[in-house]
């Protein structure tokens, strides 16, 4: 009679023990795997980074490496948590500020006010914001004596240029630009006053005389001869 063979155990421990009789009888347990320091840091941070990285050859665009990572001594299944707890220093608060690597933003009048934080006042937005206006030109306050001298010079000549304007400005302790602007404004005022004095009828008279002169030239009529343009004869 054959005796029944004993039941074979197909556990990992029995199979390993059968192949390696010298091995230990203790079951295998998962253990922490050692990882070198440098590759682990590169894995956690996403990519290896030196002490300072530069996008371009501009010294203003350098990313300083301020956050250092400790050597990795955790279990492999904890790598995901470590990656969330220690993000790369590029995403640190001081690097999220675009002013650190885009210095031209502040020099741009349309975008500079958007990245200045909470210290931006309403006055600075009006001066440097997208709707900033050019500062108004300060009007010169002329003294009565200066105005009198300027009016007399205007009566003699409505256009003062060159050495005459330079001499007049020097005698009044003014700049040539101030004298030039005053004469421009005075000529505009003079023309407006002349139009107001003549009224709308003066324009019609000028147009009528212009047409009559053209008719005389076309028909070669003398100027002294009275011509009845309304006669039907």
UniProtKB/Swiss-Prot annotation:
<dbReference type="InterPro" id="IPR009057">
    <property type="entry name" value="Homeodomain-like_sf"/>
</dbReference>
<dbReference type="InterPro" id="IPR050877">
    <property type="entry name" value="EMX-VAX-Noto_Homeobox_TFs"/>
</dbReference>
<keyword id="KW-0371">Homeobox</keyword>
<feature type="compositionally biased region" description="Basic and acidic residues">
    <location>
        <begin position="193"/>
        <end position="206"/>
    </location>
</feature>
<dbReference type="Pfam" id="PF00046">
    <property type="entry name" value="Homeodomain"/>
</dbReference>
<dbReference type="InterPro" id="IPR000047">
    <property type="entry name" value="HTH_motif"/>
</dbReference>
<dbReference type="GO" id="GO:0000981">
    <property type="term" value="F:DNA-binding transcription factor activity, RNA polymerase II-specific"/>
</dbReference>
<feature type="DNA-binding region" description="Homeobox">
    <location>
        <begin position="135"/>
        <end position="194"/>
    </location>
</feature>
<comment type="similarity">
    <text>Belongs to the EMX homeobox family.</text>
</comment>
<dbReference type="InterPro" id="IPR020479">
    <property type="entry name" value="HD_metazoa"/>
</dbReference>
<dbReference type="GO" id="GO:0003677">
    <property type="term" value="F:DNA binding"/>
</dbReference>
<comment type="function">
    <text>May function in combinations with OTX1/2 to specify cell fates in the developing central nervous system.</text>
</comment>
<feature type="region of interest" description="Disordered">
    <location>
        <begin position="192"/>
        <end position="233"/>
    </location>
</feature>
<keyword id="KW-0217">Developmental protein</keyword>
<keyword id="KW-0238">DNA-binding</keyword>
<dbReference type="InterPro" id="IPR017970">
    <property type="entry name" value="Homeobox_CS"/>
</dbReference>
<keyword id="KW-0539">Nucleus</keyword>
<dbReference type="InterPro" id="IPR001356">
    <property type="entry name" value="HD"/>
</dbReference>
<dbReference type="GO" id="GO:0005634">
    <property type="term" value="C:nucleus"/>
</dbReference>
<protein>
    <recommendedName>
        <fullName>Homeobox protein EMX1</fullName>
    </recommendedName>
</protein>
């Amino acid at each position: 009679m054959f005796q029944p063979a004993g039941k074979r155990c197909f556990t990992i421990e029995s199979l390993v023990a059968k192949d390696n009789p010298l091995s230990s009888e203790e079951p295998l347990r998962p253990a922490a795997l050692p990882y070198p320091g440098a590759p682990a840091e590169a894995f956690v941070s996403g990519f290896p980074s030196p002490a300072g990285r530069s996008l371009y050859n501009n010294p203003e665009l350098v990313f300083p490496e301020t956050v250092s990572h400790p050597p990795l001594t955790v279990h492999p299944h904890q790598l995901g948590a470590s990656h969330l707890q220690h993000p790369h220093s590029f995403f640190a608060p001081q690097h999220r500020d675009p002013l650190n690597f885009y210095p031209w933003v502040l020099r741009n009048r349309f975008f500079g006010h958007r990245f200045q934080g909470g210290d931006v006042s309403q006055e600075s937005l009006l001066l440097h914001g997208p709707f900033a206006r050019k500062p108004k030109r300060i009007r010169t306050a002329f003294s009565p004596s200066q105005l009198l001298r300027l009016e007399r010079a205007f009566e003699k000549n409505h256009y003062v240029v060159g050495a005459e304007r330079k001499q007049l400005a020097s005698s009044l302790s003014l700049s040539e630009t101030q004298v030039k602007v005053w004469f421009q404004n005075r000529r505009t005022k003079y023309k407006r006053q002349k139009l107001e004095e003549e009224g709308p009828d003066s324009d019609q008279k000028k147009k009528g005389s212009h047409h009559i002169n053209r008719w005389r030239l076309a028909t070669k009529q003398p100027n002294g001869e009275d011509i009845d343009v309304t006669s039907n004869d």
